[in-house]
C-alpha cells in the first residue's frame, strides 16, 4: 500500500456521536476534510444544524441528526439511516458525553483548591450518578452495539471511543461518576475489540487530558485557567480539540489496521507527572 493510501478515508461512511461541538466536531472535521461522508449525531439541535450547514457550505459531505444517546432506539435508527444512506458504515466515533459536576475539591491543579460538599460521596445523588453513567457508559455501549450490527457482516470497520485521562488517573476536581464511566468505557473498548478482531473490525480509544471544550461549564475556556493548568503540563500548555484530529484520522484509516484494543492518551505529558 502506498503511503498516500494509508490515511485515505475518501468515500467512507462515518458517524460521530456528540459531533456538533468540542472533540466530536474535531473528529467530524478531520474525516470530512479528507473526503469522508459524515453524519453528526448530537443532542443540541441548534448546533447540529449550524455545524452541518457550515461544513456542507465548505464543500464537505456532512449531514446531522438530533439524537440523545440514552434513547437507544433513536440511536439505532439514526445509525441505521446513516448506513443506509452511505451503503456502508466504515467508522463510528462513540464520543457523546457529559460531565458529572464538581468533584470533592473545587479547582484544577495549580489553582486554589478546597473541598466542596456537593462533590462528597455521601452527597452524590442517584440521579446525578445515573445520568453520567447513562450517557458516558451506557451510551457508548449502545453506540458500539449499533456499529457492530453493520460492521460484522462486512467484516470491516473502525470504532473509536472517547475515554479520558481520568479513566486511569484520579483527578479530585472531576466527579467520581465521570471517572468510573470513562474507566468502564475503556474496559468495554477492550472487550469489544477482542470480540470483533476476528471480523477485521478495530476498536480503540482516545483518552484526552486537559482539552479546552465546553464540558465542565466551560471552565477550561478561561484564559486564567489555561495559563495556570498549563504550567503543570510538561508541554507547558493545555490542549485543544484540533490536537486530536491527527489521531482521529489515523485510527479511522487503513494505517491503523493492525491496532486494536488500545487507549491512546493525548495530554501533553500530563499523565507522566508535573513539569517544573
Language model features with spans:
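Catalytic Tyr-X3-Lys loop
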Residues: 98, 111-141, 156, 160, ...
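Short C-terminal tail/terminal secondary-structure segment
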Residues: 1-6, 249, 260-276
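Alpha-helical segment proximal to the catalytic Tyr-Lys
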Residues: 149, 194-195, 257
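A conserved structural motif in NAD(P)-dependent oxidoreductases
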Residues: 233-244
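The beta1-alpha1 cofactor-binding region of Rossmann-like NAD(H)/NADP(H)-dependent oxidoreductases
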Residues: 45-46, 65-79, 126, 243
Amino acid at each position: 500500500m502506498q503511503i498516500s493510501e494509508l490515511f485515505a478515508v475518501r468515500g467512507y461512511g462515518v458517524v460521530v456521536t456528540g459531533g456538533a461541538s468540542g472533540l466530536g466536531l474535531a473528529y467530524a472535521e478531520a474525516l470530512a476534510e479528507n473526503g469522508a461522508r459524515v453524519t453528526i449525531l448530537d443532542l443540541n439541535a441548534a448546533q447540529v444544524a449550524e455545524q452541518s450547514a457550515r461544513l456542507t457550505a465548505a464543500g464537505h459531505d456532512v449531514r446531522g441528526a438530533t439524537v440523545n444517546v440514552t434513547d437507544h432506539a433513536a440511536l439505532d435508527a439514526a445509525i441505521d439511516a446513516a448506513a443506509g444512506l452511505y451503503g456502508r458504515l466504515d467508522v463510528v466515533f462513540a464520543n457523546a458525553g457529559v460531565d458529572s459536576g464538581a468533584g470533592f475539591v473545587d479547582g484544577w491543579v495549580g489553582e486554589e483548591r478546597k473541598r466542596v460538599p456537593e462533590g462528597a460521596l455521601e452527597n452524590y445523588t442517584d440521579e446525578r450518578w445515573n445520568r453520567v453513567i447513562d450517557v458516558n457508559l451506557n451510551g457508548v455501549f449502545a453506540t458500539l452495539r449499533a456499529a457492530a450490527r453493520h460492521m460484522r457482516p462486512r467484516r470491516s470497520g473502525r470504532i473509536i471511543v472517547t475515554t479520558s485521562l481520568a479513566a486511569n488517573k484520579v483527578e479530585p476536581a472531576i466527579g467520581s461518576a465521570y471517572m468510573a464511566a470513562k474507566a468502564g468505557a475503556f474496559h468495554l473498548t477492550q472487550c469489544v475489540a477482542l470480540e470483533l478482531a476476528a471480523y477485521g473490525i478495530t476498536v480503540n480509544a482516545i483518552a484526552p487530558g486537559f482539552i479546552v471544550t465546553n464540558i465542565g461549564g466551560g471552565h477550561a475556556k478561561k484564559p486564567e485557567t489555561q495559563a495556570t493548568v498549563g504550567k503543570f503540563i510538561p508541554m507547558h500548555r493545555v490542549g485543544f480539540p484540533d490536537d486530536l484530529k491527527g489521531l482521529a484520522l489515523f485510527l479511522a484509516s487503513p494505517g491503523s489496521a493492525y491496532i486494536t484494543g488500545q487507549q491512546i492518551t493525548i495530554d501533553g505529558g500530563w499523565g507522566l507527572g508535573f513539569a517544573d
